Amino acid sequence: MRFWLAVPFLVFVLALVWCAGFAWFCVDALHPVSNPVHCDGIVALTGGRDRIEASLQLLDKGVGRKLLISGVGPHATLSQLSEHAPISLTPELASRITLGRRAVSTIGNGSETAQWATQNHIRSLLVVTAGYHIRRAMVEIHRAAPEVMLHPYPVRSPALRRSPNRATFSLLLHEYIKWIGSHLGLSRGVNLTPQS
C-alpha cells in the first residue's frame, strides 16, 4: 500500500527533474560563444551555413591545424560551402580541409570524425555545431572516439536568434529528448552511408 502511495510522489519528482533539465538545456543552448580552445583539429557538423563559416574562420586563425566538415552532401564543393565565409580560401587553407560525405546523422558524424581523427593523429578536437545540438554531438563523438579530448564551440543558430515562439520551443524540446536518448544509447541507427 505504501508503494502505491509513493508512486505519485516519484512521478512528481521525476517530472520536476525532467523540467529542470530542460530549463538548463535551453539556457545552455543559448549560451554565447566562448573563446575557442586551440586544438589539433576542428570538426564542423553540417546543418547550417553559420557552422561552416565559423569553422573556416577558426581554421584561418590557427585554432586548429586541420578541419573536417562532416555530413557534406554528395555534390557539394568546398567553394560552394565557403562562398559566404568572411575569409579568403587560399590553396594552403583548402589543403587542410576534409569534406566528410558519409555521415547522415549525428551518430554518423561521430563515426566519421573518429576515423578522420585517427587518420590525422588528432588528439584534441574543437566541435563546431549549433548550441542546441552541441551536447548531443559531444556525446556521440566521445562515444566513437573516447581517446580524443573534445572542446565545444557552440554557434548561435538563426532559429534561436529570433524571439522565442512555438517553433523554437519545439526545436529545443525535440533536441533535449534526443540528447537524453543519446546518453541512454537509444536510437543507435546506421552510422554511415555505404562506401562505394
What kind of region is each of these model predictions?
Residues 15, 21, 135, 179-185:
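Generic signature of intrinsically disordered, low-complexity segments enriched in small/polar residues
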Residues 27-166, 172:
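A structural signal for short, hydrophobic/glycine-enriched beta-strand patches
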Residues 163-194:
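A transmembrane-helix-recognition feature enriched in membrane-embedded lipid enzymes
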Residues 2-33:
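N-terminal type II signal-anchor transmembrane helix
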Residues 20, 26-36, 40, 178, ...:
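Proteins with a high burden of low-complexity, intrinsically disordered sequence enriched in S/T/G/P/A and R
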